[in-house]
Each structure stands twice: as C-alpha cells, then as structure tokens.
Amino acid sequence: MQIALAPMEGLVDNILRDVLTRVGGIDWCVTEFIRVCDRLLPASSFDKLAPELRQGARTAAGVPMRVQLLGSDPVCLAENAALACELGAPVIDLNFGCPAKTVNKSRGGAVLLKEPELLHAIVREVRRAVPANIPVTSKMRLGFDSPDGALECATALAEGGSAHLVVHARTKVEGYKPPAHWEWVARVQDVVKVPVFANGEIWTVDDWRRCREVSGAEDIMLGRGLVSRPDLGLQIAAARDGRDYQPMSWHDLLPLLREFWRQAQAKLSPRYAPGRMKQWLAMLTRSYPEAVVLFAELRREDDCARISRLLGVEAQVLEACVA
C-alpha cells in the first residue's frame, strides 16, 4: 500500500510539503502544477514551484517529490517534461483534474476530460520524450460534468503510457462537494491494467476503510484530509498494520505550526505570509478545537510580529482555553 500527499495548487506548496512530510506516513508527494502553455519554460519556473529539485527531489524529511505539469499541447508538455527530468524530476505527473475555472478556460486540467483522444496524445508524447526509467503518471477526475466518460478517459491515459492513475472520485462540476464516488474507482480498476489510487473525501481512518471496501483500491492519495489532520497517513498505516497508535495532539502539532510560520516568513513577503498561516490554520480547525481558538485570534491579524507572539507563548496555553 502506498499513501501519497496530493498536489493542491495554492495550498500544498514546498513549505507545507516540507512540514507535512516531517510527520511521517507519506510515501511520496507531488508539486503544485507547473503551467505549460506554448513554450519551453525556463529552469527558474521549475525551481520556483519545485525547489526540492535542488536537494535530490526530496523534502527535508527525505520523502520523494514528483513534478506535475498541466497543459493541453502534447509537444510542448513533452519538451517541458524532458527539461524537468534533466533538472532531476524522478517522476512526471500530468494534471487532468484541476477544477479551477481559470485553468479550465485556458484548456487545462479537468476540461480535457472532454477529449480522451487528446489525453492519450499528451501521455504518449510525454512518455516518448522522457527517459525510459522515468515513470509518467496521471491524475484525473471522473469527468467534467458527468462520469459517463470516466472509463474511456482512464483507458486513454493508461494506454498512452501512464504508469499509474490517481482518480479523484468526483467530476469537475462537483468540485469538492461530498460524496466522493468511490465505486467509480473500482470501475476504473476493472478496465485498466495499471495501479489506481483512490482520492477524495478520506478524512479519517474510518473513511479510508470505507473507501477501500467500496473502491477496492489499496493505494490512496490524501489531500485536504492530511492537511487538516497531519498524521492521518500514520493513523491509516497503523490501522492497516494492526498497530496501536496515539493520534497527534495539539501539543505535538505546535512545533510544526511554528516551523511552517518560520519558513513562511523566510520565503514569502510580509504581505503574503500571514495569509498562508491562516489558510492552514483554518483547515486545522476541522480536527483540532485548539485551532479554532487560535484562528479566532489570528483571523484579522496581519502583523507578523504579533502572529509570532501568538504562535509562541500564547499558543502554548490554548489547550487550557478549550479544556
């Protein structure tokens, strides 16, 4: 069984990848998508979104990182995939699942699920362009507005050369609205000969158990569930192995919050760092009552010094506040 950290544009950047993979329970992670239009990108474009390439394509914790590309031009994607490999990418992942309207309007992401022939052509050209030892993988949704074409799309990707598929079990139109249709993951597995990862609505160990039962998928990709519960991978791995596991407490999480904030201040401008901190903290409120208290304190705060104080001394007494 493999447990992967999902690529989430605007959320799971190199800072959050670093922090989440320190926790453990993640076998590999993926960059935010690198947008490919009509030209060969400069190396700096890859360095910006995938700085781990400078350290052997691994996070500081040693977790392998894969490079994800998004676009609709098979030849241009192939050229950029080859460059990514030259820069050290160990795997090329192709994005056919992004639901963002701005991305879809420019023929990127989930809108391409309307064109299974193009999906096949993209994967085929990328597969031809990169070294034989570099896997090419694909992430897809069930379709744009209906899952009716999901099996045709999955077949096109697999036959084009995808080493595995990650299936986000919702359509583009459904976005992130529950439920995830895990039964479609099972149907995809029935028609392709490559491994299939289940993705979508896995927030807890019980969700994982239900997903495995319905989808039949052994491998999973965790997105928002892991962001809101950083040790979810460890919890699932323990349940899989029949081991006892004590979930991460708020006290355990605080050092990670502070490390995230330290890196955010070092890598982002004072204008943007507070927003990134609040973005992650808001997602943590789903799993930690203490995060609700801290988020209420930080919600309207944009001063980095005051945020640092709240994450320091005051953060240490939050458990008492909610007890």
Swiss-Prot record:
Record keywords, A-Z: Flavoprotein, FMN, NADP, Oxidoreductase, RNA-binding, tRNA processing, tRNA-binding
GO molecular function: flavin adenine dinucleotide binding; FMN binding; tRNA binding; tRNA-dihydrouridine16 synthase activity
Domain of life: Bacteria
Residue positions of the active site: C98
Pfam family, one: Dus
SUPFAM superfamilies in the cross-refs: FMN-linked oxidoreductases
Site feature (Interacts with tRNA) residues: R35, N95, Y176, R276, K278, R299
Binding site for FMN: P7, M8, E9, Q68, K139, N199, G200, E201, G223, R224
Coiled-coil regions listed: none
The EC number(s) this enzyme carries: 1.3.1.-
TM regions (residue ranges): none
Record-linked PROSITE patterns: UPF0034 (PS01136)
Cofactor needs: FMN
Catalysed reactions listed for this entry: 5,6-dihydrouridine(16) in tRNA + NADP(+) = uridine(16) in tRNA + NADPH + H(+); 5,6-dihydrouridine(16) in tRNA + NAD(+) = uridine(16) in tRNA + NADH + H(+)
Keyword DNA repair: no
Record-linked HAMAP family: DusC_subfam
Described purpose of this protein according to its UniProt entry: Catalyzes the synthesis of 5,6-dihydrouridine (D), a modified base found in the D-loop of most tRNAs, via the reduction of the C5-C6 double bond in target uridines. Specifically modifies U16 in tRNAs.
Entries under PANTHER family matching the protein: TRNA-DIHYDROURIDINE SYNTHASE (PTHR11082), TRNA-DIHYDROURIDINE(16) SYNTHASE (PTHR11082:SF26)
Family: Belongs to the Dus family. DusC subfamily.
Protein name: tRNA-dihydrouridine(16) synthase
